Amino acid sequence: MSYVIDRRLNGKNKSTVNRQRFLRRYREHIKKAVEEAVSRRSITDMEHGEQISIPGRDIDEPVLHHGRGGRQTVVHPGNKEFTAGEHIARPSGGGGGRGGGKASNSGEGMDDFVFQITQEEFLDFMFEDLELPNLVKRHITGTDTFKTIRAGISNDGNPSRINIVRTLRSAHARRIALSGGSRAKLRAALKELERIRREEPDNLGDIQELELEIAKLRARIDRVPFLDTFDLKYNLLVKQPNPTSKAVMFCLMDVSGSMTQATKDIAKRFFILLYLFLKRNYEKIEVVFIRHHTSAREVDEEEFFYSRETGGTIVSSALKMMQEIMAERYPTHEWNIYAAQASDGDNWNDDSPVCRDILLKQIMPFVQYYTYVEITPREHQALWFEYERVREAFEDSFAQQQIVSASDIYPVFRELFQRRLVA
């Protein structure tokens, strides 16, 4: 059997359609392989795709053929041993049994089909069927809102928006183009007139003729208008629609002393996965990072993931800071507000009821969705049970899950952000 191996790097995307059809056909195999890869690889290791293996039996095409066994009559072409009309004795044992399993120097088989998916395809399967719940349009006034932005230069426009520099530049270029030949002839005539006056001052006929030609050339140049309507350039202003759905995600991470290094690593991996999901699936979304121990602080992305600061545990400090930022920068009638909190569940005992009250009264009525992830192999503590009371009050917009080990990150993430069916 012959095989053709095509090593072209998909020149001009000629095979893209076939590749997409193949990915759709074996979607379940690929999704399973991607889920296994996510649990096996680091969340930060997303700079390459994944090698997918599909069992050979699953890519076989169904074909119609004669079954084994039974009595069949077949006509064969003749050869040097048999001539037309002769009958060949039927072999004994017409059934199709199985071999004894010993090694043989003949026979064929089929290996698993292995291929590589790209980083883009890997992330597509990784975040398939995930979304931010309850994302709705905010600040609806019956019309879209716009902002005016500059969009270059136009040949038409309002006189108040004329661009003087570009207009004069265009006029100067036009004058040079239209009078360039006449100016060259004028320079030559002036040079010749100067020569004749210097060398042949008595040659009045040529001098008079050159003076007449020079006057005609100057008149021709002067007839080129200094400014023409063709030269006018205007600043072009266009209206750009503002997004009607604005969203912000608050990321609250516990970095207190009770969080072991392994627990902090799991929390960081969860937030890296969340951040990757948001930036890939939502073009316009803001992310607010808050780290907390006994006090909370808003930080940038770099400090959120890599700072080594630690301390005691007062979870309510992060919730209070979130509420303050919401009130200051994100009006609830304009923004879809989301939050994701990760902690090991350890908290100062008197602070857990405070967290519950802040959520119930100051945060949950104004957010679209709030997720709490507790990273611990131990039994739940007071904070978990206080949050359960919040979940009872806001069943559709509050979710809590437990992560025991790194292998739980991706399944829990999918559970929290699984696309919901709308009745």
Swiss-Prot record:
Region (Disordered) location: 84-107
Disulfide bond sites: none
Classification via Pfam families: DUF444 (PF04285)
Biased composition (Gly residues): 92-102
Record family assignment: Belongs to the UPF0229 family.
NCBIfam families per record: PRK05325.1-2, PRK05325.1-3
HAMAP family given in the database record: UPF0229
Protein name as catalogued: UPF0229 protein PSPA7_0730
Source organism of the structure: Pseudomonas paraeruginosa (strain DSM 24068 / PA7)
